[in-house]
A protein has these predicted regions:
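Active-site segment of metal-dependent pyrophosphate-handling enzymes
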Residues: 62, 66-103
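Conserved hydrophobic/aromatic beta-strand scaffold that supports enzyme active sites
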Residues: 17, 26, 95-97, 117
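N-terminal strand-loop-strand
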Residues: 2-42
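Short aromatic/basic micro-patch
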Residues: 41, 90, 117
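The catalytic Nudix box helix
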Residues: 42-75
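NUDIX/MutT-family hydrolases
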Residues: 102, 106-137
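Short, charged/polar surface micro-motifs in flexible loops or helix N-caps
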Residues: 19-24, 32-34, 48-49, 77-80, ...
């Protein structure tokens, strides 16, 4: 419940942190932040139908970043609130760590302005949202060595 007694809406998404050595895939969605600025973030989105969160994260990585990855580990959840049509929405995003397997970041979908590789240390500082920066830091500590 919110402070005014109304039931709070809930929203869930799943996302991926895709690493290749010391690089991580980041995206710039076409959709801007509430203040109009562009966002530097991680691929994520809602599960389709009966998809598991892991399946949704894998699909979103492929669609939004143009790459595929091998699932390594669950990194955790980011939780935050946002406003939609005058209601507070409690959002949860579960992130997974993937090791890059194939694909090209130039093959991202139309919802994404840009997808690119970035040094993981830089991403841990430069991503727009603190929760996503934390997921990258967790990935840094859990990333397996290169094959």
């Amino acid at each position: 419940m919110s402070s005014d007694g109304r039931r709070r809406a809930r929203d869930f998404s799943a996302g991926g942190v895709v690493v290749d050595g010391d690089q991580v895939v980041v995206i710039v969605p076409v959709k801007r932040a509430a203040d109009g600025r562009s966002v530097l973030g991680l691929p994520k989105g809602h599960p389709d139908g009966d998809e598991t969160p892991e399946e949704a994260a894998r699909r979103e990585v492929a669609e939004e970043a143009g790459v595929t990855g091998e699932l390594i580990d669950e990194l955790g959840e980011v939780r935050y609130n946002y406003e939609r049509r005058g209601r507070t929405v409690a959002k949860r995003v579960r992130f997974y760590l993937f090791r890059y397997v194939s694909g090209n970041v130039a093959d991202h979908d139309h919802e994404i302005e840009d997808a690119r590789w970035m040094p993981i240390e830089q991403a841990s500082r430069d991503l727009t949202y603190a929760g996503e920066r934390e997921m990258v830091r967790r990935a840094m500590s859990r990333s397996p060595p290169d094959r």
